[in-house]
Amino acid sequence: MDKFVIRGGTPLLGNVRVSGAKNAALPAMAAALLTEEPVILENIPQVRDIITERNLLQAMGAEVELGYGRAHHRTTLCCRNLVNPEASYELVKTMRASTLVLGPLVARTGEARVSLPGGCAIGARPIDLHIKGLEKLGAEITQEHGYIKAKATRLKGNHIVFEKITVTGTEDLLMAATLADGETVMENCAREPEVTDLAHLLVKMGAKIEGIGTSTLKITGVEKLHGAKHRIIPDRIEAGTFIIAGALTGGDLMVQNCDPSHLGALLAKLEENGVKIRSNGDSVRVMSEGTLKPGDASTEEYPGFPTDMQAQYMALATQCEGASVVVENIFENRFMHAQELVRMGANIKIEGRRAIVRGKTPLSGAAVLASDLRASASLVLAALVAEGETIIDRVYHIDRGYEHIEEKLRGLGAEIKRIGELFPKKASPVAVS
């Protein structure tokens, strides 16, 4: 099992380039199911979740060529000959975003069979909002043997109001509505940049969508969509992780190929902590000198403080002078990294959805265990400032969403090495069709 060995104490210095957003690439790949024509996606990150999505689409009969190593990380998908409209449990259990194929499949082929995702390390992410929305669009939904089965001759436009904000639910039903008969109005939609990026791709494919970037989307269905070429937005969570790495280690970093407008809540919070931030076009410079001030962070849907940055911010809070309070409002059970940070010397008390972090505490290297993607990132950050050597086990979690993170950190001066093989041959990201 892969591990990271990190020796802390080195300020990070230099430039780092952010990869494409995994959470934008996954729905974009699913959107290729909506057309018989090729869809070309650029800036696709080389991470495990993309490999899983490729395997899922190929199992349905799609041709997928992951062009890593080529210009712009260009990926081509062609779903002309779909032979098996099913997402198996073996694939869905490793990546819950696999359920994003439900809407596109039933919209284009009239049927879909998608495994229920089961449990999740960071709490419930129910698929019921997807199901209720598809039923509103006229799909007949049944559940059998752990699978959701959807059928429809052609979906019909309707008025959908989400009971709670859901990113994947918004994306799934948005894709389905593009091929529905008539007009669909969706209210209380997620406004994350990744949702907006998907909408822009769909418009390039011929979809008619109004209200992009707002909480109300109006979709006028069309008979068919065509191929398109699209560049995936930069990964705001990777950018935020490196920005915190610079602040935490007392470094001076230029985080390049990012969109500062997607980072507003995080950058504002870090400035409260005393971190110097300079945004310029597609880059953010982070400088940290002297004492970090404590601060409180409460996760919210976009444009609020992102839940996917909560664990990383907690690592920063351990090095702030005073008490910080971190509140997790999106998911339950998303403080699993806290006990591992405590093993390294952090002073953290959990009270329900609140974590009280008292700093500044010296951290020391220890053997720790990663429980999920963002928890992995928080442990890497803590290890960068810990005295001595930290061994992080189960780093396959971090490989799901960060492209070659150890290489990028080494390029900034960090002492980090991997034990194990990043992409075993059976999971090779090399171009396959």
UniProtKB/Swiss-Prot annotation:
Which Pfam families does its entry note? EPSP_synthase (PF00275)
On whether Cell cycle is a keyword of this UniProt record, the answer is yes
Q: Which InterPro entries match?
A: Enolpyruvate_Tfrase_dom, Enolpyruvate_Tfrase_sf, MurA_subfamily, RNA3'P_cycl/enolpyr_Trfase_a/b, UDP_GlcNAc_COvinyl_MurA
Q: Which reaction does it catalyse?
A: phosphoenolpyruvate + UDP-N-acetyl-alpha-D-glucosamine = UDP-N-acetyl-3-O-(1-carboxyvinyl)-alpha-D-glucosamine + phosphate
Subcellular location per the Swiss-Prot or TrEMBL entry: Cytoplasm
Chief subcellular location: cytoplasm
- In this chain, UDP-N-acetyl-alpha-D-glucosamine is annotated as bound at 96, 125-129, 308, 330
Modified-residue entries (2-(S-cysteinyl)pyruvic acid O-phosphothioketal), positions: 120
Which domain of life does the protein's organism represent?
Answer: Bacteria
Q: Which residues form the active site?
A: 120 (proton donor)
Q: What class of enzyme is it?
A: transferase
Record keywords: Cell cycle, Cell division, Cell shape, Cell wall biogenesis/degradation, Cytoplasm, Peptidoglycan synthesis, Pyruvate, Transferase
GO biological processes:
cell division; cell wall organization; peptidoglycan biosynthetic process; regulation of cell shape; UDP-N-acetylgalactosamine biosynthetic process
The catalytic activity of this protein is classed by the Enzyme Commission as: 2.5.1.7
User: Key word Cell cycle present in the record?
Assistant: yes
- Spell out the PANTHER family in the cross-references: UDP-N-ACETYLGLUCOSAMINE 1-CARBOXYVINYLTRANSFERASE
Name listed for the protein in its UniProt record: UDP-N-acetylglucosamine 1-carboxyvinyltransferase
Q: Which organism is it from?
A: Koribacter versatilis (strain Ellin345)
Protein encoded by which gene:
murA
